[in-house]
Amino acid sequence: MNKILWKPANKSDTHINKFIDMVNTTYYQDLQTYDDLYHWSINNISHFWKASLEYSKIEYQGTYENVLDNLKMDINVKWFSGVNLNFAENLLVHRDDKIAIISKVEDYPSRQISYRELYKQVEKLSSALRELGVKKGDRVAGFMPNILEAVIAMLATTSIGAIWSSSSPDFGIISVSDRF
């Protein structure tokens, strides 16, 4: 596919360009292109991920000494050891009327939900889960299709610090049973 689908009006306003500028300033580099950034990232894994965390402004608690404990990328790598973050906290940081999610389900009309409404619905469900006794570390499983309400349930669960697991009914009884 060679057709350009979208091109930014001003390259300097893009996040990738702003990130490259930050890397250049922080690490005394002269990266100019995405390809330059890519090569720098694979040769400077810890610096790249530290810069990514800083640029993204992800909220977290704790401190880390090392970005990762093993430069060999295997299944036992520990990233930002000593740091905890809450998925829902970071996804629910916005509370305005901009569109947060567009839901498209086969044979149904599209639905949209704003950040404000998403926050309200997550807050309402997380309160109900707390009233049921769900607390940090508990497990909550959802047997539901991949629809907007599943996202709300996941965010409500993780906002408490509980662990969310879901399975769509399309998987069939045996697959769902194996998964849970």
Model-predicted regions and their roles:
Residues 36-40, 101-155, 172-177:
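Conserved AMP-binding/adenylate-forming core of the ANL superfamily
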Residues 158:
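Anion (oxyanion) recognition and catalysis
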Residues 23-28, 88-117:
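AMP-dependent adenylate-forming
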Residues 1-75:
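N-terminal amphipathic, basic-rich helices that act as targeting or association modules
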Residues 169:
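C-terminal catalytic core of Y-nucleophile DNA break-rejoin enzymes
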Residues 161:
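Structured binding elements
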